[in-house]
């Protein structure tokens, strides 16, 4: 796996690396890519942020990598689905004790409505030398809060690569296509029903971009609302006796059973039939339990994915359950469980025996703090990660002592993972810059449990590789 220059490559059999390409070839390739990207952004009325910090020189990767990801995702979906189905009923497994949730989350998850879902697992590329695995990647977390931001970045970059005047050499093709990613994203929703996107804080660029794609595919324009606009209205035809609505202007007020919908204070309301969600965990905590319950029933997103799957502790639960999934529940074979074990970073849960063992071994000196990191259970964008090598010995041990308690407040709740030494790649990120030794973090998208496409690679010379910490994004290509 390495970065190549399409302009300098004359044959798929003899690709030319970006580090060996001439300045002139690289400049032509960069100009063609930038022109295609800016044209696409302009045509779709997207933010220029999607053109920032991108490298046009793609990563050439083996097709077998994609096949491994597809197979892995199939098994991951089987494992997670079985765990979610047993979450409340399996008293022996006692998942709520192993992974405690906030009270408002526990109450609403008992009223969920299973819907299509979006997952975006992140993967690391370990340095060569592990004889115990045949997989080239390790999944370090699953992101499932919102499909919009990262998927749209991938759509823009693969579209620019496809539309660039620098043609792909015969025998090579893009690892994903913009059209297939857009189709997958739009498939989360029913185009025959109105769509509302609930947004609370932060930039609206991802939602604006999604709205453009959705309009082009369906001819419909989603209505973007804030969480504070949500209301409930009585409706005898609903299983809960209520329907989810939002504040509307008098001209657009909706009707239910032939009657205008108004709130108790006389506000004209508009019924919500399906929603896309761009909200943080704090946003959900600020909703009333009744509104949250109705979101669970009416929402297009199964809230178990937000409160359970997207929590970093879920990987630890999966790891703990692998033997049970084989020998007790019979949903995986031993070989399939081993694929998941090899492909998931070992994640240690607060309050677990593994956490107690790690603390004991650290005190004994048999393991080093430098070999571990702590990751906020509800963190995102690479923020809040603590590397053991950056902590003092007493500080590290003190954190592990705290993590003996699974009921820690949310802002003190971490998982512990081994620090994975990642492979380094010689990459050109900036124009006219010397190649840098960088690590790469990958991602892929899954819709409805099925692999939907590879995302773009993130590359940086820093230890935490995140686009929000300054990492560059790079598309990928594979042999036909």
UniProtKB/Swiss-Prot annotation:
UniProt keyword terms in alphabetical order: ATP-binding, Ligase, Nucleotide-binding
Protein's UniProt keywords contain Calcium: no
Keyword ATP-binding: yes
Residues covered by region (Disordered): 1-30
Catalytic activity: NK13650 D + L-aspartate + ATP = NK13650 C + AMP + diphosphate + H(+); NK13650 B + L-aspartate + ATP = NK13650 A + AMP + diphosphate + H(+)
Comp. bias (Basic and acidic residues): 21-30
GO molecular function: ATP binding; ligase activity
Pathway: Secondary metabolite biosynthesis
Function: ATP-grasp enzyme; part of the ank cluster that mediates the biosynthesis of NK13650 C, a highly modified cyclo-arginine-tyrosine dipeptide. AnkG catalyzes the last step of the pathway via amidation NK13650 D with L-Asp to produce NK13650 C. AnkG also amidates NK13650 B into NK13650 A. Within the pathway, the cyclodipeptide synthase ankA acts as the scaffold-generating enzyme and is responsible for formation of the cyclo-Arg-Tyr diketopiperazine (cRY) from L-Arg and L-Tyr.
Protein name: ATP-grasp enzyme ankG
Organism: Aspergillus thermomutatus (Neosartorya pseudofischeri)
Gene behind the chain: ankG
């Amino acid at each position: 796996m390495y970065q190549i220059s399409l302009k300098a490559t004359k044959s798929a059999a003899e690709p030319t690396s970006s580090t060996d390409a001439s300045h002139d070839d690289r400049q032509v390739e960069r100009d063609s890519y930038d022109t295609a990207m800016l044209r696409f952004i302009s045509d779709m009325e997207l933010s220029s942020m999607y053109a920032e910090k991108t490298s046009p020189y793609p990563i050439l990767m083996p097709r077998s990598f994609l096949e491994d990801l597809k197979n892995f995702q199939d098994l991951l979906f089987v494992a997670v689905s079985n765990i979610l189905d047993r979450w409340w009923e399996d008293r022996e497994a006692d998942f709520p004790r192993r992974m405690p949730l906030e009270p408002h989350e526990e109450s609403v998850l008992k009223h969920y409505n299973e819907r299509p879902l979006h997952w975006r697992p992140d993967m690391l590329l370990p340095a060569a030398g592990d004889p115990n695995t045949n997989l080239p990647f390790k999944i370090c977390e699953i992101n499932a809060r919102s499909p919009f931001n990262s998927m749209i970045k991938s759509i823009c970059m693969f579209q620019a690569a496809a539309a660039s005047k620098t043609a792909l050499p015969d025998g090579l093709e893009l690892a994903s296509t913009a059209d297939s990613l857009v189709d997958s994203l739009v498939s989360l929703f029913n185009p025959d029903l109105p769509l509302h996107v609930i947004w609370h804080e932060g930039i609206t660029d991802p939602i604006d971009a999604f709205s453009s794609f959705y309009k082009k595919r369906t001819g419909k324009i989603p209505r973007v609302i804030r969480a504070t606009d949500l209301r409930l209205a009585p409706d005898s035809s609903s299983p809960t006796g209520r329907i989810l609505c939002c504040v509307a202007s008098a001209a657009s007020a909706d009707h239910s059973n032939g009657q205008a919908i108004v709130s108790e204070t006389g506000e004209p309301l508009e019924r919500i039939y399906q929603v896309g969600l761009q909200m943080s965990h704090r946003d959900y905590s600020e909703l009333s339990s009744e509104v949250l319950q109705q979101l669970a029933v009416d929402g297009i997103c199964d809230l178990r994915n937000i409160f359970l799957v997207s929590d970093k502790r879920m990987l630890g639960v999966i790891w703990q359950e692998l033997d049970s999934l084989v020998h007790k529940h019979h949903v995986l074979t031993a070989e399939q469980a081993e694929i998941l074990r090899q492909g998931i970073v070992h994640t240690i849960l607060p309050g677990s025996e593994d956490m107690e063992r790690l603390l004991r071994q650290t005190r004994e000196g048999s393991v080093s703090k430098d070999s571990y990191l702590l990751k906020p259970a509800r963190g995102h964008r690479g923020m809040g990660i603590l590397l053991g090598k950056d902590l003092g010995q007493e500080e590290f041990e003190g954190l592990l002592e705290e993590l003996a308690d699974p009921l820690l407040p949310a802002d003190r709740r971490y998982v512990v993972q081994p620090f994975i030494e990642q492979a380094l790649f010689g990459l050109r990120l900036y124009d006219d810059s010397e190649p840098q030794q960088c690590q790469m973090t990958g991602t892929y998208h899954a819709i409805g449990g099925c692999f939907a496409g590879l995302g773009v690679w993130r590359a940086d010379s820093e230890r935490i590789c995140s686009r929000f910490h300054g990492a560059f994004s790079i598309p990928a290509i594979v042999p036909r």
